[in-house]
Amino acid sequence: MKDVFIIAFSAYGGPNMHLALYQKRLVEEKKYLTTEQLMEYFSLCQMLPGPSSTQTLMSIGYQFGGRVLAFLTLLVWVLPAFILLTITAIFIGAFQDQALGYLRFVQPVAVGFVIVAGVKMVKKSVKNRQGYLLATMAFVVTALLRYPLDTWVNMKTPWMFPIVLVTAGLFSFFDFKGTVQKYKPIKIKFPWRSLVTFVVIFILAGVLGKVSSNPLVILFENCYRFGTIVFGGGNVLIPMMLEQFTNHISNGASEPFMTTGEFLNGVGLVQAIPGPIFTIASFT
């Protein structure tokens, strides 16, 4: 836990930087696990929705202490960023005009962070013609056609992103022409109870979030949905949250949760604070 706490206070730069810190502290210095084990955990977590670096750290905790240590690892990992962002959000809420004045230069910096993150993700993930085609399609639909689609088919909703993701996933599945490496099957006891619980909560949260006007219920549904459908790290989460919290008006509300300026302040601050980018949820 001490090592995780130390890493949490020096974890700038996103998942790849976090992985380098894990390698240095947990593998090379403490020798808790090997480089091969670390990369296996990270590769597996890359295929799962949610924050890959956080899930990797939780997997290491689970290896040594089961569910309890995995949960405590998560708590220690996100606590510093959570506390700092929560205090900042309270400060902005209490001193609205003055706080926004102090943070007026954070917004353009935050836009720069988002652009750089987008360029890095394109360089890392788009490597062939099909990839460029899918990236272009996603950009056109979510950025250029958002308002025309809103007029025609009511597509200006948070569900635009999962629809694009599912479409791209199906295209990639049917277009795959590579070879699958042989593997030695192993017998495991699959935790069906956990999977069923996860699906039931997802469905109930979606239904309650649609019919309820309670902001806490709606916020829970939003964050649970984000964690379920986000692949690729915290930077992918930012445009989804921007659409949900600044453009979408929830049931019983007269305006969005926050303004674009307030959200960009949060984006800039989370980049300046150690820890996972997903902790921006505490700011919102």
Name these PLM-found stretches.
Residues 1-48, 59-284:
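Multi-pass membrane proteins that catalyze or facilitate reactions on polyprenyl-/lipid-phosphate substrates
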